[in-house]
């Protein structure tokens, strides 16, 4: 096995939406920098970013009830929903910029307008949804949202969901037309085509084996060319680890202090996909329910219209599964291999704390198809087993860390950037809301890792993302202006526009 040595400015590990976004930002901000990407699979966007491996929801907290918790005094905390919506607006602005500059084209291949709806049953849940609707109605980001507890109105909105419903239990929904379905796999592939045109070297079938700091403070990345077995060493002043579930083991190899006391717990996802085109045509919305009491946030059930390969699809889920792999293409030894002397107590503490999650996962793994159909029928009473197939979605590695609020071994359900003190290396860990907030998260990487460049870069960032540094929730006119311009650039329908 021969060994090859190379030097570059930036190395991105993993050809998913995060590396694609960071690479695209850097090429606009520092076009002269040399960037190399290493991906162990044969194409971009094949793991978590792949359209079959995530829900494809443009997460803007329009319908996801886990972002609007009810406080002990009965009021609704909307702060998380506002934050996530603001972050999605940043993604929309950057995508619209790329389209307007002809850096990517055919936005309809990756983003489509689709109503986002929340659906609840039972008196308490209906009261909660009404309070949530009132709280969000005062915020520009959620303008255009409608609430109804009238079954006749709901039949107009979601005929499949209402058909065959015999219960007299109260039912209510909210609907907002400014929701989107995003094909993150298609977007990732587009961005990598754009990066190749910008002279970024993208190396597929290259597996990163080790990351070590050199004597001059840069990073040496050991890469194996999978087919030939050739070992290469590439050095760079900045390395980003965006390998989805594979990021934690690579972060551990760096040895940076920030990588200690962090663990990961893999959760796999299953969806049911409708194989009957007549049924698919009768539904046109992403309808999110409420997680059952005691179930984790990632278990929120939803019945989704999706656009995949320019074809309308209908999916229901997620159902959780368990695999010790950190990636769909990973190893059964990933989980045990990630347990180190410096994080073993963090992992054990999480195991003791999260017995309810363990119980939930065991129950989910044991579900038969008919039991899954029973859950679907809570949403869609007339669903027929023969119309639905099971699809295995992606692996997600939930972060486990020690926190002040939660103590040792606290399970985190968000997305987290871990970077070295000097900003020379950063990794992205975690899951939801993930890809929808990719641009915000990669700007966070830039702020953490290139603070000395931010003043110089600010005008260009503002050109690409006009709301950068400004709260759209507090600036109605700016939000309406940006929402309209991004809708036009991205080819979203007139219905999607927010009107004053």
Swiss-Prot record:
It catalyses: (S)-malate + a quinone = a quinol + oxaloacetate. Its cofactor is FAD. Pfam families: Mqo. Pathway: Carbohydrate metabolism; tricarboxylic acid cycle; oxaloacetate from (S)-malate (quinone route): step 1/1. GO terms for biological process: tricarboxylic acid cycle. Belongs to the MQO family. HAMAP family: MQO (MF_00212). This is Probable malate:quinone oxidoreductase. It comes from Halalkalibacterium halodurans (strain ATCC BAA-125 / DSM 18197 / FERM 7344 / JCM 9153 / C-125).
């Amino acid at each position: 096995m021969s060994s090859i040595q190379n030097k570059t400015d930036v190395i991105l590990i993993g050809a998913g939406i995060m590396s694609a976004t960071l690479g695209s930002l850097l090429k606009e901000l520092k076009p002269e920098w040399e960037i190399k990407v290493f991906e162990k699979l044969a194409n971009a966007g094949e793991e978590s970013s792949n359209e079959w491996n995530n829900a494809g929801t443009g997460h803007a907290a329009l319908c996801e009830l886990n972002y609007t918790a009810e406080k002990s005094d009965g009021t609704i905390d909307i702060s998380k929903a506002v934050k996530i919506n603001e972050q999605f607006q940043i993604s929309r602005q950057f995508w619209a910029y790329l389209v307007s500059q002809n850096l990517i084209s055919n936005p309809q291949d990756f983003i489509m307008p689709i109503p986002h709806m929340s659906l609840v049953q039972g008196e308490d849940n209906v009261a909660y949804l009404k309070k949530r609707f009132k709280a969000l109605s005062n915020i520009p980001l959620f303008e255009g949202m409608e609430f109804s507890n009238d079954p006749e109105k709901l039949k107009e909105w979601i005929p499949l969901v209402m058909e065959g419903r015999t219960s007299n239990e109260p039912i209510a929904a909210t609907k907002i037309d400014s929701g989107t379905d995003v094909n993150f796999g298609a977007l990732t592939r587009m961005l990598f085509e754009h990066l190749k045109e910008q002279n970024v070297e993208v190396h597929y079938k290259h597996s990163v084996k080790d990351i070590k700091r050199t004597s001059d403070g840069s990073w040496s990345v050991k890469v194996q060319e999978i087919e030939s077995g050739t070992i290469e060493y590439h050095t760079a002043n900045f390395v980003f680890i965006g390998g989805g579930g594979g990021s934690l083991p690579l972060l551990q190899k760096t040895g940076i202090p920030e990588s200690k006391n962090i663990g990961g717990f893999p959760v796999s996802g299953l969806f049911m996909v409708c194989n009957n085109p007549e049924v698919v045509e009768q539904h046109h919305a992403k309808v999110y329910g409420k997680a059952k009491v005691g179930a984790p946030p990632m278990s929120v059930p939803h019945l989704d219209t999706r656009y995949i390969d320019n074809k309308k699809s209908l999916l229901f889920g997620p159902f959780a599964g368990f695999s010790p792999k950190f990636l769909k293409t990973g190893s059964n030894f990933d989980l045990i291999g990630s347990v180190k002397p410096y994080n073993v107590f963090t992992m054990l503490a999480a195991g003791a704390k999260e017995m309810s999650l363990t119980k939930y996962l065991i129950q989910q793994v044991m579900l038969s198809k008919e039991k899954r159909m029973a859950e679907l029928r809570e949403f869609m009473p007339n669903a027929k087993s023969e119309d639905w197939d099971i699809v295995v979605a992606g692996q997600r590695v939930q972060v486990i860390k020690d926190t002040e609020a939660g103590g040792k071994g606290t399970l985190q359900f968000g997305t987290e950037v871990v970077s070295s003190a000097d900003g020379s290396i950063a990794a992205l860990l975690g899951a939801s809301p993930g890809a929808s907030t990719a641009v915000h998260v990669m700007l966070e990487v830039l702020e953490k890792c290139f603070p000395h460049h931010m003043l110089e870069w600010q005008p260009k960032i503002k050109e690409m993302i006009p709301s950068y540094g400004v709260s759209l929730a507090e600036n109605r006119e700016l939000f309406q202006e940006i929402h309209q311009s991004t809708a036009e650039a991205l080819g979203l329908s007139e219905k999607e526009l927010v009107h004053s």
